[in-house]
Amino acid sequence: MSNPRPHLLIIDALNLIRRLHAVQAQQALTPAQALIATRANLINTCRKLLAASEPTHVIAVFDGEVHSWRKEVYPAYKEGRTPMPTELREGLNELQDAFWECGVDALLSQTDEADDLIATLATGIAQHGARATIISTDKGFCQLICPQIQIRDYFNKRWLDAAFVEQQYGVAPAQLVDFWALTGIGGSNIKGVPGIGPKTATQLLQQYGDLASLLAACQQEDAAKALLKLRQHQDEALLAQRLVRLQRDIPLGFNLREIRYPPAPEA
């Protein structure tokens, strides 16, 4: 019997945990009770994901106390975001143990953002012809969509696929980075081109294809009004493009054998 084609399940750990905890925090619970309930719910959710996905490999990726390269080049990156509740931050080790209880290893880096680690993992396995499923509500991962990479929004019970991207943004997944370069991403405090909103960005990309072609077109004497805005703010667009594009080539320091599921029994 041949071995099944590898299928890597990648869990955006804090994306999942924060939403599970928010539900418990709305109940009449003490912080300690909310953390206990979150842990129990996390184990239950993790087991559901494993049963539904039937992965051959699985990993939960955490954000560490990262001062990322994005913050270095753009100090306002993610400024204004609601901080994680103190009791949740203090309980993360216990929640990480909950993943291990389910047979799921955890990856945490002090130098790289979880989004870039997830992109590297998914892209790496896809390049070898295997499948990756990312569990997250973060639409930023939609730039990775291809036949080998899919994104599941667990809470809204939907796939963030090419059809979703087309409906939501009017462009293909491969054009999303350039779409956000024009519009910016409010949740990450990334500014795009002033005066270019989603509708105009969609129209421009449908006509020109990508940001490079738009930058060439905006230099023409008879450039349209929207292109003139881009000409005036092309540095902002290029910075936004750099910030929203996920890194896919981070050295990880481990191989697939170490995250096989179910894990090999200890000798």
From Swiss-Prot:
Cofactor(s) needed, names only, are:
Mg(2+); K(+)
Q: Does the keyword Cell cycle apply?
A: no
Pfam families from the UniProt entry: 5_3_exonuc, 5_3_exonuc_N
Enzyme Commission code: 3.1.-.-
All residue ranges annotated as the 5'-3' exonuclease domain in the record: 171-261
Q: Name one GO biological process term.
A: DNA replication, Okazaki fragment processing
Cofactor stoichiometry and binding? Answer: Binds 2 Mg(2+) per subunit. Only one magnesium ion has a direct interaction with the protein, the other interactions are indirect. Binds 1 K(+) per subunit. The potassium ion strongly increases the affinity for DNA.
Q: Where does Mg(2+) bind?
A: D115
For this UniProt record, the keywords arranged alphabetically read as follows: DNA-binding, Endonuclease, Hydrolase, Magnesium, Metal-binding, Nuclease, Potassium
Region labeled Interaction with DNA — which residues? 195-200
CDD domains in the cross-refs: H3TH_53EXO, PIN_53EXO
What InterPro entries does the record tag this protein with? 5-3_exonucl_a-hlix_arch_N, 5-3_exonuclease, 5-3_exonuclease_C_sf, DNA_polI_H3TH, FEN, HhH2, PIN-like_dom_sf, Xni
Q: Record keywords: Membrane included?
A: no
**GO molecular function per UniProt:** 5'-3' exonuclease activity; 5'-flap endonuclease activity; DNA binding; magnesium ion binding; potassium ion binding
Residues engaged in binding K(+) = L182, V193, I196
Q: Mind telling me which PANTHER family this protein's record contains?
A: 5'-3' EXONUCLEASE FAMILY PROTEIN (PTHR42646:SF2), FLAP ENDONUCLEASE XNI (PTHR42646)
Homology family: Belongs to the Xni family.
Instruction: Tell me the function of this protein.
Output: Has flap endonuclease activity. During DNA replication, flap endonucleases cleave the 5'-overhanging flap structure that is generated by displacement synthesis when DNA polymerase encounters the 5'-end of a downstream Okazaki fragment.
Name this polypeptide is given: Flap endonuclease Xni
